[in-house]
A protein has these predicted regions:
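Active-site neighborhood of divalent metal-dependent phosphoester bond hydrolases
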Residues: 43-124, 130, 160
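Conserved beta-sheet core of the metallophosphoesterase superfamily
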Residues: 149-221
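Active-site environment of divalent metal-dependent phosphoester hydrolases
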Residues: 13-17, 42-45, 71-75, 141-142, ...
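Active-site neighborhood of phospho(di)ester-bond hydrolases with catalytic His/Asp-centered motifs
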Residues: 9-10, 34-38, 65-69, 135, ...
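Cytochrome P450 core scaffold surrounding the K-helix E-X-X-R motif
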Residues: 142-148
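N-terminal active-site segment of His-dependent metallophosphoesterases
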Residues: 1-53
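Short, well-ordered beta-strand micro-motif
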Residues: 124, 134-136, 210-214
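Beta-strand-turn-beta hairpins that frame and shape the catalytic cleft
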Residues: 1-7, 125-132
Length: 222
């Protein structure tokens, strides 16, 4: 099917209020293809709502929900333990865990973990002869997509946006735009075909942002 719009939504981080605000603006339908860039949980106050929303909407054939590094930390916590697990709670996982402990039974928790584990780490599309790669954090420069390691796809920062020279357009989250340009809560298009879509959803003045990669139109939460 030829979609009228191809949209990507950046990091959500438990801000269901901001998620609802931006989603209500985009006029989503079966004629729209939507990619979620991950990080549905942690730091906000409605992490479970955001995760459940992603679980529901990703069942649609025109929606792809990627895994973020915060979902990966959650998996480590519940499935691995040890050193890897220790980083989740201090990075906002404490709020998510409190909600899971209060509202989820074991079956519901396992369903959420299966959902996270099944999330792809990237999504690639070719539209009008242009390649687009959607990924949570970025890509290891000078490395084919099929050879990318999980850690880079979920965690990379400066090495990617300073060193990427690929021909594909890359749409990613993970690094909040205020970290690149102070007090800028708006998507950034870099010179090397990278679009940064994490606009600080968990921050006081932050936003959740959505972009149409075909038109360049941007929507943001109130």
């Amino acid at each position: 099917m030829n979609y009228r719009r191809v949209l990507a939504i950046g990091d959500i981080h438990g801000r269901y209020d901001r998620l609802s605000s931006v989603f209500n603006k985009i006029n989503f339908s079966s004629k729209v293809f939507l990619i979620l860039l991950g990080d549905y949980v942690d730091r906000g106050n409605e992490n479970l709502h955001c995760l459940q929303w992603a679980m529901r909407i990703s069942k649609l054939p025109n929606v792809v929900a990627l895994r973020g590094n915060h979902e990966q930390m959650m998996l480590y916590y519940y499935l691995l333990g040890g050193t890897e697990a220790a980083i989740w709670l201090p990075n906002g996982g404490d709020k998510t865990k409190a909600e899971l402990d209060r509202w989820c039974n074991e079956e519901e928790l396992n369903r959420a973990l299966r959902f996270i584990n099944d999330r792809p780490l990237y999504h690639k599309m070719t539209i009008g002869g242009e390649d687009y790669i959607f990924v949570h954090a970025g890509l290891k420069p000078n490395k084919p997509l099929e050879d990318q390691d999980k850690e880079s796809l979920l965690w990379i920062r400066e090495e990617f946006y300073n060193g990427y020279r690929g021909s594909a357009n890359v749409i990613c989250g993970h690094t909040p735009t205020p970290f690149i340009e102070r007090n800028l809560y708006y998507p950034i298009r870099l010179w090397n075909k990278i679009t940064l879509l994490d606009t600080g959803s968990f921050m006081r003045d932050g936003k959740i942002s959505c972009i149409d990669i075909l038109s360049g139109m941007i929507w943001q939460s109130d």
